[in-house]
Amino acid sequence: MSKKEIVAMILAGGQGSRLGVLTKNLAKPAVPFGGKYRIIDFPLSNCSNSGIYTVGVLTQYKPLKLNEHIGIGDTWDLDRRDGGVSILPPYQKEKGGDWYKGTANAIYQNIEFIERYDPEYVLILSGDHIYKMDYDKMLEMHKQKEADATIAVINVPMHEASRFGIMNTNEDLSIYEFEEKPEHPKSTNASMGIYIFNWKILKKFLEEDELDPSSSNDFGKNIIPKMLNSGKKLIAYPFNGYWKDVGTIESLWEANMDLLKYEDELSLYDSEWKIYSANPVRPAQFIGKDAEIKSSLTVEGCIVHGKVENSVLFQGVYVGKGAIVKDAVIMPNTKIEDNVLIEKAIIGSEAIVCKGCKIGDGNKISVIASKEVVIGSKEIIEECAMVK
């Protein structure tokens, strides 16, 4: 393998337990988003658009759909003999093996993979955030500042800062303190979980951390504080674009709804920074003569006979006559039968909502699992009758 300046490592093994039934049989990075995509498409597309063509995807929980989606990486121009994309699950080694115990341990277990390319830098990414970023610009700042580590940060409202890891910085953007979810934050520079490290330095800290029995083997809780305490130069890279951690039902629903705003910050229509995804070939969408669609995303393969308002419909969704779908996210190949009312909900892939059902009350977000068949008629999903 030829030497690479930078290798990207995408942490994509999370269970996503806060997404409930949506990740019962699916890794969080493989959850559908925005009508045509899966969450993992965003960091993969960012890598490709940034000219980073050596990428490791670290998988663990329910990886089948995620592995199938990534395939050989051709969708993102990552099907390369020298580099490209590699799926990296935990594996048995000569001295035994183990599941990834934390974000830092996941990278530690793949030191051999990284060393194959002898990189100057390693880019660490989360596989479950929605955003568009040019990592090359971040790398350029890392070099200019002669940093040992550069951490992307985003400004959040002060009342939300206690939910994040906060980077307190000097005027030159050097980080002097890291606070993990502080009760009384000193600043609003929230860590985005995007790191660039000088590889030789990171490798040393990973090896030392692995020998510490008290460590939780986590970048935010262990590696970053240890680097600060040892006097390493850490720099904050301010990011001003759209960024969303879609780790909860509420944030996933909100991120989909954000796509419907008149001024969409994420801008999936930007020809200069495309988000790529592996999608099956579908026929054109069909809109029936009595259908009505307002402020919605509907993609190829959809058949709509009813009313759709402020909603996101994925490939192959069917909406029957007299059905009303409002403020909803309907994932691929789901069938909404006649006279159904859905309001403020997320419906998983390949579900069937039977004739006359009512899901949601317009207040809380209701959720239907993938491949469920809803046969009841209740206002709140917890009261709905569902059968396999």
UniProtKB/Swiss-Prot annotation:
Alpha-D-glucose 1-phosphate binds at residues 100, 165, 180-181, 191. It catalyses: alpha-D-glucose 1-phosphate + ATP + H(+) = ADP-alpha-D-glucose + diphosphate. Its EC number is 2.7.7.27. It holds the Pfam family NTP_transferase. It comes from the Bacteria. Signal peptide: none annotated. Pathway: Glycan biosynthesis; glycogen biosynthesis. GO terms for molecular function: ATP binding; glucose-1-phosphate adenylyltransferase activity. Gene3D superfamilies: Hexapeptide repeat proteins (2.160.10.10), Spore Coat Polysaccharide Biosynthesis Protein SpsA, Chain A (3.90.550.10). Keywords: ATP-binding, Carbohydrate metabolism, Glycogen biosynthesis, Glycogen metabolism, Nucleotide-binding, Nucleotidyltransferase, Transferase. It is an enzyme of class 2 (transferase). One of its GO terms (biological process) is glycogen biosynthetic process. CDD domains: ADP_Glucose_PP, LbH_G1P_AT_C. Belongs to the bacterial/plant glucose-1-phosphate adenylyltransferase family. Involved in the biosynthesis of ADP-glucose, a building block required for the elongation reactions to produce glycogen. Catalyzes the reaction between ATP and alpha-D-glucose 1-phosphate (G1P) to produce pyrophosphate and ADP-Glc. Homotetramer. This is Glucose-1-phosphate adenylyltransferase. The lineage of its organism: Bacteria, Bacillati, Bacillota, Clostridia, Eubacteriales. The gene is glgC.
